[in-house]
UniProtKB/Swiss-Prot annotation:
Official protein name in the record: Translation initiation factor eIF2 assembly protein
Location of the region described as Disordered in the Swiss-Prot/TrEMBL record: 1-23, 72-96, 323-352
Cross-referenced Pfam families: D123 (PF07065)
InterPro entries: CDC123 (IPR009772)
Function statement: ATP-dependent protein-folding chaperone for the eIF2 complex. Binds to the gamma subunit of the eIF2 complex which allows the subunit to assemble with the alpha and beta subunits.
Gene source species: Aspergillus fumigatus (strain ATCC MYA-4609 / CBS 101355 / FGSC A1100 / Af293)
Cellular component GO terms held in the UniProt record: cytoplasm
Compositional bias per record (Polar residues), positions renumbered to this chain: 1-18
Keywords attached to this entry: ATP-binding, Chaperone, Cytoplasm, Magnesium, Metal-binding, Nucleotide-binding
Domain of life: Eukaryota
């Protein structure tokens, strides 16, 4: 039997102590549906920015799912008999207008853009096409025309996930007593158009709720903002009060993640989104393992009950995983003294950890770092897609010629060696 180097053995033991899979509770179909915008927004309408949810027809959903990017013409052709000769072009462009199958939705989008002052931001039931903003002239989600919206939706992997994989990793609800094999529920898809607001990204925060307890929170933008540290206590208090009064007892599930925006003067909290308690939701400044192993008041009480009378309970975890103390050790002590004091007294209120990007964090100055770069395509591919099926076929032909030429050159080079 070979001997292990002590360091290797320690590493192996550490790896063994780590769970092989994140210890999430089962994610049910209903939980995913509860986090769909059309499900939660009516309940919290007064807490959200102004928006409209447009029900989507099967033909429009099929358009989003279809390969290639074919956009409707910017101007609508007349359909009267008197105008046929004037605008006739032998029907060459008749098939190039995909909106003929969903004219009502197209008209609703136009009217909503006009109603909201000419600028909106789009999303589907769960996701906004943030990974496709590089396709936009403004490099954000701002849309002024229906075609701006269609271009973002059809260029986004996030939207594709909403359409094709919303229930990945999910299980049927435990109260489903049907003996028939569980089938995924039908999804009524919606296009959500929100009035465009130039949000200050430094004031957006993601909050994690477990067992109806606000467990922790962090900033969404991963750049350092020095002014946030002096506001940490105020913002934490605002978010905690908002959660206690508006969300704690009203959202159907005990575990979820929600996003808020708190603009100056930091008096009002706006609910921006609600996300599943699942690894598909980005934990941002935390890791999911770290969050799942955090203690909340319920876990602390259970630990107190199980502990012998002569022992004491420490807010730490066995093994090589981060402890509560270790997680907090990097936080600015001056800003987080109240969290430490809250843990010392039995009657002290539980305070969620509020994590901010510090000045010396490696990711603190990523202003020039492009987000979602893995989702981008070469400009030539995008241009070919915009030209329709013919443009893409021409591009593929040229690409194959280039590959064949490169292969031939490599072969000739090998033969001459």
């Amino acid at each position: 039997m070979p001997l292990l180097d002590p360091n290797t053995q320690t590493l192996a033991e550490s790896s063994a102590a780590q769970p092989q899979r994140l210890p999430f509770p089962p994610v049910t179909y209903s939980h995913i549906l509860h986090c769909s915008y059309h499900q939660w927004q009516p309940r919290y309408r007064t807490l959200t920015p102004k928006s409209r949810a447009i029900p989507l027809t099967p033909s429009f959903v099929s358009y989003l799912r279809a390969n290639g990017i074919v956009l409707p013409p910017e101007t609508t052709r007349p359909h009267g008999d008197d105008d046929i000769d004037t605008f006739s072009d032998d029907g060459a462009d008749e098939e190039s207008d995909p909106s003929v199958e969903w004219q009502e939705i197209h008209s609703q989008i136009k009217s909503t853009i006009s109603e909201f002052g000419g600028k909106v931001t789009p999303k589907l039931n769960w996701s906004a096409p943030k990974d496709a903003v590089w396709m936009s002239a403004t490099n954000d989600l701002q849309c002024r025309t229906p075609n701006d919206i269609y271009l973002l939706l059809k260029s986004s992997d996030f939207i594709t996930h909403d359409l094709e994989h919303p229930f990945d990793g999910c299980v049927p609800d435990p109260d489903d007593s049907s003996e028939a094999p569980a089938t995924q529920p039908d999804i009524p898809y919606y296009l959500v158009l929100r009035k465009y607001v130039n949000f200050n990204p430094s004031l957006e925060f993601r909050c994690f709720v477990r067992n109806r307890v606000l467990l922790c929170m962090c900033q969404r933008d991963q750049n350092h903002f020095d002014f946030l540290f002096s506001l940490r206590d105020t913002l934490r208090s605002r978010i905690q009060a908002f959660f206690d009064e508006k969300l704690k007892d009203t959202f159907p599930d005990p575990n979820f993640v929600f996003d808020v925006y708190i603009p100056e003067p930091h008096q009002r909290v706006w609910l921006i989104d609600i996300n599943p308690w699942a690894d598909r939701t980005d934990p941002l400044l935390f890791s999911w393992l770290e969050i799942l192993q955090m203690k909340d008041p319920i876990g602390i009480k259970e630990e107190d009950t199980d502990a012998p009378e002569e022992s004491f309970v420490r807010l730490s975890l066995n093994g090589a995983t981060p402890t509560v103390v270790e997680v907090n050790r990097d936080e600015d002590s001056e800003s987080e003294k109240d969290v430490g004091s809250a843990d010392d007294g039995d009657d002290s209120p539980f305070l969620p950890e509020f994590r901010l990007v510090k000045r010396d964090d490696p990711e603190a100055y990523s202003f020039s770092t492009p987000q979602y770069s893995a989702h981008k395509l070469p400009k030539e591919v995008v241009d070919a897609s915009l030209a329709g099926s013919g443009g893409m076929s021409e591009f593929l032909g040229k690409w194959q010629d280039i590959l064949a030429k490169q292969t031939q050159e490599d072969t000739d080079s090998d033969d001459g060696r």
